[in-house]
Amino acid sequence: MFNTSEEVRIVTETIRQAARERIAPAAASVDATGELDGEVLSLLWDLGLMTLVFPPEFGGAEQSQGTLLCTAVEEIARHCASSSLMLIIQAVGSFPLLHGGSRELLERVLPRIVERRELAAYLVSEPGAGSDVGSIRTTAVRDGNEYVISGTKCFSTNGPVASYYTVLARTSENGRNGLSFFLVDGDAPGLKVGKIEKKLGQRGSKTSEMYLDEVRVPAGNLLGEENKGFLLAMKDFDMSRPAIGAQALGIAEGAFDQMLKHSRERKTFGQPLCEHQMIQQIIADSATKIEAARGLIYRAAALYDQGKRNTKLASMGKLFASDAAMQITTDAIQVFGGYGYMQDYPVERMFRDAKLTQIFEGANQIQRLVIAREILKEAA
């Protein structure tokens, strides 16, 4: 841990205990039913975790917001990735509002969000625009004191349950320099929930298509400057990618804990599994990857908290941790053997949950391009 402030230590221990005692018991049910446990969601709000990145006067942390977000996500993902995803999406979906909304807008909507415990959704991806954000076709046309937004968004986490949406739409035909963010209320006429997706993993969060059919929003709901939405999205990544890395880290740790326990208890050829050299190699490699991932993630989070550029480390942390999580969960199933393939044991769920961390907020192939670009900038 790179930030060892008393606040971080206290929060870490509080979350760790809550995750172990109150979130872990519901994890299998959350996965099986595709429904997040209501008591777990209430717990996340009660602990102040859903507003960690908000201004302090609206329930946010006084300092170290990036580190605390990563800490909370990691500890919860160790037991239930779906529950940890709620923290990530709340932070990601709120970022354009928090960093682009006018003071008047923030003072009007943030108290409502906190009081009513409203969920956010982040509407960026489209059927023809995933990693290529500049290809977004959803439009926002100025009409007097309003903007009229029309288009289709996909893979919208929290789409069916959110109360407010931050929507990236095209305000000019200037590629990525023609995009703008808007705040859209969940009850806005013309905003409709489309197909609810059936997912491989992290099933406790609802993901859907979203349709915007001439949705009218006040001009004051523009977040940041017009045509500067792409830059706001890139800044959002500097916060979200370490958090996703932390989720991958938590999943990897959870699988490692299960693997280690099983390898000590299960006997084969007259001795515990952990006494076999091939199993020891898996244990050693997994533990090393976990420690290396933690270093990258919390360095990136510390830079974010200091207001310093962390783009390279944020991508490195997400890339390394998510690849490590995929490998460690795969190896955990291998150590469990046939039992690991069965839903009676949590490692198969962790394996499915890990895959998303290699994809969302920029696929790992994109992370490699970002890392190389940043290195070449530094070398120029």
Curated annotation (Swiss-Prot):
Cofactor: FAD
Keywords associated with the record: FAD, Flavoprotein, Oxidoreductase
Reaction equation(s) it catalyzes: cyclohexane-1-carbonyl-CoA + oxidized [electron-transfer flavoprotein] + H(+) = cyclohex-1-ene-1-carbonyl-CoA + reduced [electron-transfer flavoprotein]
Known EC number: 1.3.8.11
Gene3D superfamilies linked to this entry: Acyl-CoA dehydrogenase/oxidase, N-terminal domain, Butyryl-CoA Dehydrogenase, subunit A, domain 2, Butyryl-CoA Dehydrogenase, subunit A, domain 3
Pfam family membership, one: Acyl-CoA_dh_1
InterPro entries hit by this protein: Acyl-CoA_DH_CS, Acyl-CoA_Oxase/DH_mid-dom, Acyl-CoA_Oxase/DH_mid-dom_sf, AcylCo_DH-like_C, AcylCo_DH/oxidase_C, AcylCoA_DH/ox_N, AcylCoA_DH/ox_N_sf, AcylCoA_DH/oxidase_NM_dom_sf
Chain's role: Acyl-CoA dehydrogenase involved in the anaerobic degradation of cyclohexane carboxylic acid (CHC). Catalyzes the 1,2-dehydrogenation of cyclohexane-1-carbonyl-CoA (CHCoA) to cyclohex-1-ene-1-carbonyl-CoA (CHeneCoA). An alternative substrate, cyclohex-3-ene-1-carboxyl-CoA can be converted to the corresponding cyclohexadiene-1-carboxyl-CoA isomers (30% rate compared to CHC).
The family this protein is said to belong to: Belongs to the acyl-CoA dehydrogenase family.
Record's protein name: Cyclohexane-1-carbonyl-CoA dehydrogenase
Organism: Geobacter metallireducens (strain ATCC 53774 / DSM 7210 / GS-15)
